[in-house]
Amino acid sequence: MVKIKPFAGIRPPKELAAEVSSRPYDVLNSQEAKAEATERSLLHIIKPEIDFDPIADEHDEKVYKKAVENFKKWRDNKWLVQDGEEHYYIYAQTMNGRTQYGLAMCCYYEDYWSGKIKKHELTRIEKEEDRMKHVELQQANLEPVFFAYPDNDEINKIVADYVKNNKADYDFTAAPEGFGHHFWVIRDKKINDRITEIFAGIPALYVADGHHRTAAAARVGKKRQESNPNHTGNEEYCYFLAVTFPASQLRIIDYNRVVKDLNGMTTEQFLKALEKNFTVEPKGKEIYHPSKLHNFSLYLDGQWYSLTAKPGTYDDNDPIGVLDVTVLSNLVLDQLLDIKDLRTSKRIDFVGGIRGLEELKKRVDSGEMKAAFALYPVSMQQLIDIADTGNIMPPKTTWFEPKLRSGVVIHTFDEK
């Protein structure tokens, strides 16, 4: 059963919420961040390399130092202000007319090590350590991780009633995506206490997005424990910031692939080779979207094709083997195109479905890439099944949208 707690969040005044909050550090590069950052944007804190001209190496010591300076400046200028009491917070997001309702909370670092916070991706040590360094220097979780939890009717009712009966503290539409962000401070102590009690009966949380931030936060907690002879387990550094959503409200969108070449084959040879494991149907020049699991779109030489994996080419009882990313990797990328390692190969790139299949067409038509594959999205249930069985998804399998804004609320464990 998971352990959570409310916290005294650091957050912008209402009139600055849209300007201070920003997209997460890992969805835009330094040049994009520099162009997007206004004077008070959190990007100056989470991507502080943009404050140097020319843009500095993000791992340079002066960059980490600048992040600390900027966080202090934002607080000194009252662009970020700490709440006087501990709360849970409702953070809702609207995309394409659909709203999902999360709870901003502090999660317990030991739940990560004990497996109650379940992951589905591998992490890279160097990325963990970069995030760790920021957390340790700031003594804060500046950016939340994105978790899912098994649906709970009482939590759903608490959130729905609070939203209905209380005006949002923030309510804004964020550029450049145009998604709505809505935020309530839960100021009723009885409700906050009840949320803690209910989550104590929830068996697990699932990392949806933010595996490196989660690992980094858990490592910081463990490191602080080991260096504190008087550690009790109740210290603020034992907790880290997450926004946690009911699993049924989340949607994973497609995460597609583009390849540079056909491994020496002509178009005709490649299409013929595909017929061994797929039913191949030409679809013409109109964009074709995969219609169901095990159905893929192929864009090649100005034409779209439907590829449907034949029965027997995947195992319905294998939570990893049944994934379309695995089917495509095994039967096409590996067998036909000799692309063995998706993490290191320079012959493949990945395109989040938020960009649409038009982006795949553009990458191929420009001559940059030879072919594109669009996949049917993974379901939340597939993600949960994989995490529950201790398996790891292949690289670049899940893309969640909308992303959480960074700086809507921050958790600090600075106990000075």
Language model regions located:
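Surface-exposed, charge/polar-rich loops and edge strands
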Residues: 1-416
